[in-house]
Swiss-Prot record:
Task performed by this protein: Catalyzes the conversion of (8S)-3',8-cyclo-7,8-dihydroguanosine 5'-triphosphate to cyclic pyranopterin monophosphate (cPMP).
Oligomeric form and interacting partners: Homohexamer; trimer of dimers.
Protein name (record): Cyclic pyranopterin monophosphate synthase
Alphabetical list of PANTHER family matching this protein: MOLYBDENUM COFACTOR BIOSYNTHESIS PROTEIN 1 (PTHR22960:SF0), MOLYBDOPTERIN COFACTOR SYNTHESIS PROTEIN A (PTHR22960)
């Protein structure tokens, strides 16, 4: 059975010591969805939003968030990310925006939290930029899609 790595023998939260681990190439992908009214989505797609390019702003927010995950999640290590990618796709048939993030590095610990943070921050940025038009948008299905590298092995989410 797996144990919680961030809890010490006294039941206290602690940062995992990764100093003895070997560097390996690690990669993680995550996704999130923002569901909204068709009119809100059309405003984003057409580029007519008064605050500017929603997708470009959300992409930059996701990249910045991945780089600063260690400042947001208390027990995360600061990481030297070698790649962060955030892709946004309008899904008009579902009135959604799909966000997929990719984080990669060669290091001692995984990048799952960075990928999840990137997707989440991009979704939050879409909400922030569009809340004046629609307050009942829904951010949902934030999840890890895959991870590779490290001693715990690879993971691929079920469809």
């Amino acid at each position: 059975m797996n144990t919680f790595t961030h809890i010490n023998q006294n039941g206290e939260a602690n940062m995992v010591d990764v100093s003895a681990k070997q560097d390996t190439v690690r990669e993680a992908r995550a996704e999130a969805f923002v569901t909204m009214n068709p009119e809100t989505l059309q405003m984003i797609i057409s580029g007519n939003h008064h605050k500017g390019d929603v997708f470009a702003t959300a992409r930059i927010a996701g990249i910045q968030a991945a780089k600063r995950t260690w400042e947001l999640i208390p027990l995360c290590h600061p990481l030297l990310l070698s790649k962060v990618e955030v892709q946004l796709e309008a899904l008009p048939e579902k009135n959604q925006v799909r966000i997929e993030s990719l984080c990669k590095l060669s290091g001692k610990t995984g990048v799952e939290m960075e990928a999840l943070t990137a997707a989440s921050a991009a979704a939050l940025t879409i909400y922030d930029m569009c809340k004046a038009v629609q307050k009942d948008m829904v951010i949902e299905q934030v999840r890890l899609l895959s991870k590779s590298g490290g001693k715990s092995g690879d993971f691929v989410a079920k469809s």
